[in-house]
């Protein structure tokens, strides 16, 4: 079985990097992106990305535009939008598997459990 591959989209390195390191320690291959444009480049350049975890307020195109693009161009990739913007809840619910269940600051264990649930829901691994 190959390592699940995740992209974390977060402009703040003090948030992004510790979460990425934690998920790596838990057995995931993690790519880090500072904005939606960088995340798109990673998704286009890498094979078999499983999950994209993006800040709803990501710079450039933003997390919602990224999620919309992923749904259209890469429908097999699971999308998680995170943030603390209550107004965005309805829109996030339309773009994510289960709505906006992650808030910031991230609880690393909650993120890990959420990612595991998403990956388990897609069926057998590649």
Label the predicted regions:
Residues 44-47, 69-76, 94, 117:
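Conserved phosphotransfer cores of two-component systems
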Residues 32-51:
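Acidic, metal-coordinating helix/loop segments flanking the phosphotransfer/catalytic sites
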Residues 54-71, 86:
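Conserved phosphotransfer microenvironments
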Residues 10:
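Conserved acidic carboxylate
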Residues 32, 58-61, 105:
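Residue-level signal for the "D+5" position in two-component response regulator receiver
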Residues 13-31:
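Two-component/phosphorelay signaling modules centered on CheY-like receiver
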Residues 106-119, 123-124:
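C-terminal output helix
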Residues 65, 81-103, 109, 113:
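Alpha4 helix (beta4-alpha4-beta5 surface) of REC/receiver domains from two-component response regulators
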């Amino acid at each position: 079985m190959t390592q699940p591959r995740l992209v974390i989209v977060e402009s703040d390195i003090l948030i992004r990097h510790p979460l990425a390191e934690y998920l790596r320690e838990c057995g995931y291959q993690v790519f880090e992106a500072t904005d939606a444009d960088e995340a798109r480049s990673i998704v286009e350049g890498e094979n078999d990305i499983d999950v994209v975890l993006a800040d709803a307020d990501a710079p450039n195109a933003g997390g919602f535009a990224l999620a919309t693009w992923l749904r259209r161009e890469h429908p097999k990739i699971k999308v998680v939008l995170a943030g603390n913007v209550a107004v965005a809840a309805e829109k996030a619910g339309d773009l994510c598997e289960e709505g906006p269940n992650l808030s910031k600051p991230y609880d690393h264990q909650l993120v890990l459990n959420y990612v595991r649930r998403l990956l388990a829901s897609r069926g057998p691994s590649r």
